[in-house]
Amino acid sequence: MLDEEGRELPRGSTGRLAVTGPTGCRYLDDERQRDYVQHGWNVTGDLYRVDEDGYFWFVARADDMIVSAGYNIAGPEVEWALLAHAAVRECAVVAAQDPERGTVVKACVVLAPGKAASPELVKELQDFVKQRIAPYKYPRVIEFMDALPKTATGKLQRKALRT
């Protein structure tokens, strides 16, 4: 587990998963070398937490991590909380620009059949998330959508939601 400067982190910390060894990932004469090989480590792009027993726990893809007012918020954790609500059929969480906090959590929500978007439902979903995970992680922006953008193979296109 590494921090942003490539220093190893102690157990209990969340950081970038990286591996090193006699073999590994090399991009000779390729710009990707700078992104994926740093300080002698092959950086995976995943964030993990190592518990006190040495077990690794997936937190999020590094590009799915949202930093809001100095807090690190894993988008998938917010998604799991939202998906537990009966009104939510599908959702995706991304960062949205905010003048005060830098970024905030934005949830793009596809409602379950028979459910209707309303300001009351926005508040209900926000309160629901606050009861399940740390309150500072709740989505400050909720956008209701008919469908989430996906590729032909069904993979979510988060980039399209960040605009």
Residues covered by each model-derived region:
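General small-molecule cofactor/ligand-binding pocket signal
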Residues: 142-145
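Noncatalytic, basic helical substrate-engagement surface that gates or grips nucleic-acid strands
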Residues: 31
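AMP-binding/adenylate-forming catalytic core of the ANL superfamily
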Residues: 8, 18-21, 25-26, 35, ...
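Short beta-strand-to-turn element immediately C-terminal to the catalytic PLP-Schiff-base lysine
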Residues: 2-3, 20
